[in-house]
Amino acid sequence: AQVSSQFMPALHDTSTKTLSYHFANQTISAAGALEYANYIDVVFNQSDTALYICRKLYRYFVNHDITPWVEQNIIADMAQTFVANNFEISPVLTELFTSAHFYDISVRGAIIRSPLETLCAMLNTSNTTANFDLQSTYQIYLSMYGLADQMGQGYAAPPSVAGWTAYYQAPAFYRLWINSTYIKKRFDVANLLTSNFYNVNGNVFKIKVVDFLNGLSAPASAPQVIDDLCLVLFPKDIPAADKLAIKSILTNSLPDFEWTLQYNEYLADPTNPVFYNPVELRMQAVLNVMFKMPQFHVC
């Protein structure tokens, strides 16, 4: 339904309104139904208005930490673009998203993913979808909603009209997504999606880890598998020691050639559970660990 409004002159204060010192005590003269528009003009004529909005955009998309350099070289330019384009958001975002700063390695991994972003990252990076009958698919995605809610973000159910505090509450901002309760819930979701135990009406919903593996550049090479997974799952590279630890999970602490033999045996007879199951188990174990690493929970 459409929402309408009407101006009632008899109830309107026709006197001149004097604004606070924040607006240099400017006045709004009697203009009837147009006074609100005049007030909006006063607000947007303040240089701080554009800066304030651009800081919010920067915090949402890049980093909550606005240094003096960022304020002078990034925020100020965004604000100029904002004003020059009659306060249209799109040109400002285009400028930000195409800037070298947006892709700088120093700001990668600066934002903790929200619960919905974390859940979608697990599913989307592995090309996981529910392709069952309508009822089962609905129940599965309803369960996904429940998982996000348990992690602290029920879709379309923010705690207040201001939204989730992680998006605006200084000084913690998105660090509010993580506490001793929510981090365990994130780990529980990782366990669930990398196992064979999420069953709805006889349909097992899980990340198809072998299909994910087959889509990598060199599935038979254990070191390359780990490199590819790090590239897909993490915003920046991780230490070599961490990669070795993950690779030992993939190879079950055996030499790399053992993984090559195991994968090639599967490849020669992909429907044989004798060869398929061990590959699936190793990949499930690897993804389970990587989904719990701190690097996965930032973007």
What is the role of each PLM region?
Residues A1-P68:
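Non-catalytic, conformational "gating/processing" segments within enzyme and secreted inhibitor domains
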Residues Q46-N85, L93-C299:
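Flexible, low-complexity segments enriched for small/polar residues
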